[in-house]
Amino acid sequence: MSEMASMDPEGIDGVRMTWNVWPRTKVEASKCVIPVAACISPIRYHRDIPSVEYAPLRCRICTAALNPFARVDFLAKIWICPICFQRNHFPPHYHVMSETNVPCELYPQYTTVEYTLPNPSQPTGVGNFDQTGAVSGQPSPSVFVFVLDTCMIEEEFGYAKSALKQAIGLLPENALVGFVSFGTQAHVHELGFSDLTKVYVFRGDKEISKDQVLEQLGLGASGRRNPVGGFPMGRDNSANFGYSGVNRFLLPASDCEFTIDLLLEELQTDQWPVQAGRRQSRCTGVAISVATGLLGACFPGTGARIVALIGGPCSEGPGTIVSKDLSEPLRSHKDLDKDAAPFYKKAEKFYDALANQLVNQGHVLDLFASALDQVGVAEMKAAVERTGGLVVLSESFGHSVFKDSFKRVFEDGEESLGLCFNGTLEICCSKDIKIQGIIGPCASLQKKGPSVADTVIGEGNTTQWKMCGLDKRTCLTVFFDLSSSDQSSAPGGVNNQLYLQFMTSYQNSKGKTLQRVTTVTRQWVDTGLSTEELVQGFDQETAAVVVARLASLKMETEEGFDATRWLDRNLIRLCSKFGDYRKDDPASFTLNPNFSLFPQFTFNLRRSQFVQVFNNSPDETAYNRMLLNRENISNAAVMIQPSLTTYSFNSLPQPALLDVASIGADRILLLDSYISVVVFHGMTIAQWRNLGYQNQPEHQAFAQLLEAPQEDAQMIIRDRFPVPRLVVCDQHGSQARFLLAKLNPSATYNNASEMNAGSDIIFTDDVSLQVFFQHLQKLAVQS
């Protein structure tokens, strides 16, 4: 059982916590240094989760769903809610229940249950489900509006169009498809008008309101209108305006696949003339704004995605990130720090407003940015992250990172991402537990209540969140606070257990409305008497990820925040609190095994791209943070502290220390840092390979040695989204930097004489892990 738990630490519930036993008071919790937080995967697949064809039974006071921790009086047909202790009567259809015949949501092993909710006959607004009516109407189809940048060179444009054709071919037949292209202007293509190509043109140089979008598309309150001058009139044009917007602009994939193929064949790169020394006019903001308005008119409150393929920076209209003058560089982190990025705040404000509109409509923005330059991911971050959108950053639309990732989005079967739509998360918790907020792909619905904390972290001030887009890998970090009242009398005095319930309603890819209910319990402990139970309940991997997410948020939102200093202080406080030592004797310092890996995580976090942002562009930093905030604990931990595997003739593949000492001339190393996978050949291995030894029959063992890391790398790549970049390099080669940058610099130019033969050194002044530990021990034991 323990072996199973270690293989799948999230279990059936998909929940991991920093502390698996909780201190009773706010003061004691603050002494624990690491925040009390839970990382939840709301719709993670697990084969043991039962599915039932009815809606959950809810407590009439706190609205928590019936669960295995409820106390049930089978004779009186009453259940007592474990969260608020309210007595609730079972409805008549539960009256056949007895001690030997209980509904599945009361089985002790089913702490997570998935319910099927009735589909509303028509959308009634964001997150409104008619849970009392019978199932009515067909399941809602998935809706996709593709937004394509035309300001690219022909080769890139060809790759992007080819990917779009493939994606539309992979969509379910009933999925609805719309198409917007943009360059200097934004073009909405009327796919329902098959006689000839018909587009609605929007100026790219000025902001356009939702009402203006609807009016120009003929979807506004005034309804029908004559076409704008210059647009072609078809012979059935008068009848065409009798169609709804859905029939005109959004068609089933099976009906419009041929039309879009023809359209893409004819579509050219942006033909607007560009003067020498000037950037192309690219109106990204207007195009996404128009797509948002179109979906808002046709499908408010129903799951839909805007899939944007962008090949460069916005230089026209709202959302502009750089001027058209090529001599002006794109903003850097230094510019943002000095407030020297003239377009940044205005563009960020524009996308914040767009994020609010998308959240209110229940729609998702997915961003596929492929360019050697920045495209504005940093400014768009709110619109992508708050709607639960996917983001992929690559160098080219022809690169495998984009092509394979884009294909994965639309694939079905085991390899699919399990994309779902229009989700709402609700959290109920025991008295004296307060919710500070969530870091991750969601948006606060501002639903106040007694469980809302005064302090806010991330998306807070609520007990309900909108998740316009979510998938089976989506992970959220929920931060909790304890009420400042003394809990000696309550809740622990009455009940030593605390309860948390996570309820996620969502629309799956087939259009069915489901609700997953997860109820977990943990124990209160009095840490004033002993910290032993607290220590045993510490999850250091989860704690490292939570601290990384919190540090990233603080770097974004707090001016002048020094992440390295904050991480160091927290680590010293944690080691002082939970380490075993004699005061002022560093040699006596030891850490419990439950804490022993945490300093190493912190060391690697300090050196990672999440903290050392000045080596990256603002777009890369925003991309890295969005991935960190949405991935599960195991994947996020690999982003912070990559895994290293060594391959040699003498032994089977085995984990290696993330240290420069692991490099050997006769070894191959495989580094997994999540967004890149590096296969690194030692000097001797590379020489033998270049001489072609692997092609000789007597050297089959060498051929197998070369193949093994490549096969393992492909296994990692197949299981991951976005698809990581594969780097194959040799010792002392130019691309060896991808490995060296992640290794502990135990051997540098300062102590090169101590290194082993065939090993390597790192040219850096960074401290090594060993020196870091020495300083930590010294500071942790100080009086």
Swiss-Prot record:
Binding positions (Zn(2+)): 59, 62, 81, 84
GO molecular function: zinc ion binding
Pfam families, A to Z: Gelsolin, Sec23_BS, Sec23_helical, Sec23_trunk, zf-Sec23_Sec24
Main location: membrane
Biological processes, Gene Ontology terms: COPII-coated vesicle budding; intracellular protein transport
Keywords: Cytoplasmic vesicle, Endoplasmic reticulum, ER-Golgi transport, Membrane, Metal-binding, Protein transport, Transport, Zinc
Renumbered residue ranges of the record's region Zinc finger-like: 59-84
SUPFAM superfamilies, per the entry: beta-sandwich domain of Sec23/24 (SSF81995), C-terminal, gelsolin-like domain of Sec23/24 (SSF82754), Helical domain of Sec23/24 (SSF81811), vWA-like (SSF53300), Zn-finger domain of Sec23/24 (SSF82919)
Membrane disposition: Peripheral membrane protein
GO annotations of cellular component type: COPII vesicle coat; endoplasmic reticulum membrane; extracellular region
CDD domains: Sec23_C (cd11287)
Top-level division of the source organism's lineage: Eukaryota
Subcellular location: Cytoplasmic vesicle, COPII-coated vesicle membrane; Endoplasmic reticulum membrane; Membrane
Family (UniProt): Belongs to the SEC23/SEC24 family. SEC23 subfamily.
Its biological purpose: Component of the coat protein complex II (COPII) which promotes the formation of transport vesicles from the endoplasmic reticulum (ER). The coat has two main functions, the physical deformation of the endoplasmic reticulum membrane into vesicles and the selection of cargo molecules.
Quaternary structure annotation from Swiss-Prot or TrEMBL: Component of the coat protein complex II (COPII), composed of at least five proteins: the Sec23/24 complex, the Sec13/31 complex and Sar1. Interacts with SEC24A.
Entry-linked PANTHER family: PROTEIN TRANSPORT PROTEIN SEC23, PROTEIN TRANSPORT PROTEIN SEC23 B
Protein name per UniProt: Protein transport protein SEC23 B
Lineage, opening ranks: Eukaryota, Viridiplantae, Streptophyta, Embryophyta, Tracheophyta
